[in-house]
Amino acid sequence: MNTNEAKEYLARREIPQLFESLLNGLMCSKPEDPVEYLESCLQKVKELGGCDKVKWDTFVSQEKKTLPPLNGGQSRRSFLRNVMPENSNFPYRRYDRLPPIHQFSIESDTDLSETAELIEEYEVFDPTRPRPKIILVIGGPGSGKGTQSLKIAERYGFQYISVGELLRKKIHSTSSNRKWSLIAKIITTGELAPQETTITEIKQKLMQMPDEVGIVIDGFPRDVAQALSFEDQICTPDLVVFLACTNQRLKERLLKRAEQQGRPDDNLKATQRRLMNFKQNAAPLVKYFQEKGLIMTFDADRDEDEVFYDISMAVDSKLFPNKEAAAGSSDLDPSMMLDTGEVIDTGSDYEDQGDDQLNVFGEDTMGGFMEDLKKCKIIFMIGGPGSGKGTQCGKLAEKYGFTHLSTDELLQNELSSESGRSKLIRDIMERGELVPSGIILELLKEAMVASLSNTKGFLIDGYPREVKQGEEFGRRIGDPHLVICMDCSADTMTNRLLQRSRNSPQADDNTTTIAKRLETYYRASIPVVAYYETKTQLHKINAEGTPEEVFLQLCTAIDSIF
């Protein structure tokens, strides 16, 4: 490699900027173990997304300290004016005043900055008063962030901040300002506004709201670097709401909004660029908040009222958990909570993990898992309690090499874990409410992906329990290749459950609970069976006979399809 190639490599990889940032951090922090310190800094560079995200002060401490009085009446000095040593042998030349340069940066060029807009180290919230609850609402352009943010603010009496609207108003009111004219051009092309400028505007807006109990911030952060900056300069949010939406739906909504509102950043070129930026930045951003246990994901492809119903349940659970429980934890029965047919709409889809929407930006981002799932043989096993579907699924799995998944068991396993999602599920069940179908679908999808490499197909027991669940499964994963309905009379199922209760001391089956479960099953299963009769291969199996007789019928049905 010659000298020119080396220089080109260093410049292209932003190596000088990285070294400058590391050196500034070392000089300011003076760590006892510089090697360990540098390792932690390099790890942060990875989290930020690479060297191009690093600035000169990325590793400079953000601690707020009382500064000594300034001499000579000067109100502002360079932050690092005294960092460089006075030793004349020090290899770097120190300037009292930097020479002019031809290139400029919106954030640092003096021609583009106003004294009043310089970022100051100040407390955004009064430390002597309770800090307001902060909810960040993120999602792709057109995912409904503004709509849902306003609904959240109205329901809980919170204040609402739209970061996009904040910047647009600033641009409109300072149209003659060179800096903001450039920012306007950046936004119009679909790029992100400069990070520090955006943070400054948010801080100034927050300081105008000293008495709010809560604040909903829409459209920020857009990447991990912005998230880190928000936490460093403002606070750690109490909750992050992620509105997951397919690319196609986002495009449709943006085109419709462009016709109705005429926003400058909704032009076709800008829309494509914004979607690309979102797709690149969303996965690491979601992962970052997942690791902190702060994020909850919602399917935003649905009606806005359905989405908000799910969000409000999650906010109640996360931020206002001290509500009177409807049942003791020892009384929880997952199979009852999963039964449908109640008036409550369970067509929700929220979860505190973003795994579903490592494909939310388009299925390609799930690394091919979704395509592999769609190629797998999928069989739904529908039947009432006591119909024998669990027993038969076990035998079929052994014969055909299928993976047997029971929604009841998946829910029980999740409840026994210590995840944030398990706490949310338990809180919902303790209130006597139904577990949202989105959570069940997420548990199913995670289990299916985990078994992809060593299975020939999936037998899903006890799913779907309503038409909406089946529709959602078809849209998110794919339609089943076969739906089996275990046709069994109420008397037979009741007798089997009572026998099971006598054989298993832990079983809580009694005549009253059995009757209720059967009633719920019949009410919910009729439309499900009708739905699949018109849509796919549905086989009704006479489940009144012996296990061997029923198994033979099932094998015949499966062999006829596969």
UniProtKB/Swiss-Prot annotation:
NMP 2: annotated span: 406-435
Catalytic activity field: AMP + ATP = 2 ADP; a 2'-deoxyribonucleoside 5'-diphosphate + ATP = a 2'-deoxyribonucleoside 5'-triphosphate + ADP; a ribonucleoside 5'-diphosphate + ATP = a ribonucleoside 5'-triphosphate + ADP
Oxidoreductase among keywords: no
Annotated positions binding ATP 2: G386, S387, G388, K389, G390, T391, R500, G545
UniProt entry keywords in alphabetical sequence: ATP-binding, Cytoplasm, Kinase, Nucleotide-binding, Transferase
SUPFAM superfamilies: Dimerization-anchoring domain of cAMP-dependent PK regulatory subunit, P-loop containing nucleoside triphosphate hydrolases
GO annotation, cellular component aspect: cytoplasm; cytosol
Region ranges (NMP 1): 162-193
Positions contributing to ATP 1 binding: G142, S143, G144, K145, G146, T147, R257
Region annotation (LID 2) ranges: 499-509
EC number: 2.7.4.3, 2.7.4.6
GO molecular function, one term: ATP binding
Positions of region (Adenylate kinase 2): 377-559
Pfam families registered for this protein in UniProt: ADK
Keyword ATP-binding: yes
NCBIfam families (UniProt xref): aden_kin_iso1
Functional description taken from the UniProt entry: Nucleoside monophosphate (NMP) kinase that catalyzes the reversible transfer of the terminal phosphate group between nucleoside triphosphates and monophosphates. Active on AMP and dAMP with ATP as a donor. When GTP is used as phosphate donor, the enzyme phosphorylates AMP, CMP, and to a small extent dCMP. Also displays broad nucleoside diphosphate kinase activity.
Family of this protein: Belongs to the adenylate kinase family.
Protein name (Swiss-Prot/TrEMBL): Adenylate kinase isoenzyme 5
Organism encoding this protein: Bos taurus (Bovine)
Upper lineage: Eukaryota, Metazoa, Chordata, Craniata, Vertebrata
Primary gene name: Ak5
